[in-house]
Amino acid sequence: MQAILRLWQPCNSTPRTALLVFAMLAGIAAGPVLAASGDTGQMEWWNMAMKLFGGLALFLFGMEQMADALKAVAGERMKIILARLTTNRFMGAATGAFVTAVIQSSSVTTVLVVGFITAGLMSMAQSIGVIMGANIGTTITAQIVAFKVTKAALLMIAVGFSMLSFSKQEKIKQYGGMLMGLGMIFFGMSVMSDAMSPLRSYQPFLDLMASMDNPLIGILVAAVFTGLVQSSSATTGIVIVMASQGFISLQAGIALAFGANIGTCVTAMLASIGKPREAVRAAVVHVMFNVFGVMVWIGLIGHLAEFVTWFSPSHPELSGVDRLAADTPRQIANAHTVFNIATTLIFIGFTGQFARLVEW
């Protein structure tokens, strides 16, 4: 059992953290260096690129910081919940959603599930419910980043850092880490948004974004990008940032969110290499569920867009790009949530069939 619980610890966290810190430092240092070069055109492009990389690094590092703090606060309870409350498919899905919402990583949930299967604590059919529910848990991140509270980001970082550094109580330190991580998420989004604002008048980029209205292109681009960064939440966050600048339509944002769901399967597949057969089967279930879900919904993107537009908050006093930028981020987050909940409800009745298919 101890070997399974050790799976909770994030893999390769040190290299990833070092990469994020390097990207942040590069983004900070780029401005003065390029300003001294005297090449205005080149300076603008490189400055924009470094701000994007630096903002993305802050966003990812903030997610990591918040997730680590959440796991420190509720980690042991999450492991107990995951091991015990999966007696049927519906409880499994609810448990997977709750655990993933807390730890902010469907990949970590999948790794834990693999460990429980290998130890005989969970059947393959039970694990499928948890894997399906994990997708619902990841929608929490999109809902959080859709809030426009970037002006409070630096205050959140400062307060969180103070709690983390000066408090004597471990719980206060952990809550401070959560607050600082959340502030870094919003500050990273603000940096990325500022970096992309000049692109509003750059026609080739606008034409490229218009091509994302083709759902197949949007899904492919997001799947590849998510596979590279190994974080669907990062992809969704960037999509919401682009939407906040009015670069993409709601339908394009939905297609990109679909692609992120497929791309996140890469992490589980890589983690299953060289592992027991049960690990490979769980990873295959993850891929099948996400791909089948996108296949069901790809022809319904327009209807999904109409539905979330109907119940999402809007700003009728605005028009044109300004209204698109104001309305679309929350609509994309809501579409992402509706898609994952509905897909889980559609397939939750077929966990036995999924299990037999991968065990065949």
Where are these regions (language model features)?
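N-terminal secretory/membrane targeting signals
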Residues: 1-35
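Hydrophobic core segments of alpha-helical transmembrane domains in multi-pass membrane transport
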Residues: 21-29, 51-65, 96-100, 157-166, ...
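Helix-loop-helix hairpins and the membrane-proximal interhelical loops
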Residues: 35, 39-85, 89, 179-224, ...
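Alpha-helical transmembrane segments of multi-pass inner-membrane proteins
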Residues: 42, 46, 50-51, 55, ...
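Alpha-helical transmembrane segments of multi-pass membrane proteins, especially transporters
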Residues: 56, 76, 80, 84, ...
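C-terminal ends of transmembrane helices
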Residues: 64-72, 113-118, 159-173, 268-274
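Membrane-interfacial helix-loop connectors
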Residues: 100-103, 109-137, 143-152, 160-164, ...
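Membrane-interfacial segments at transmembrane helix termini in multi-pass membrane proteins
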Residues: 276, 298-335, 341-360
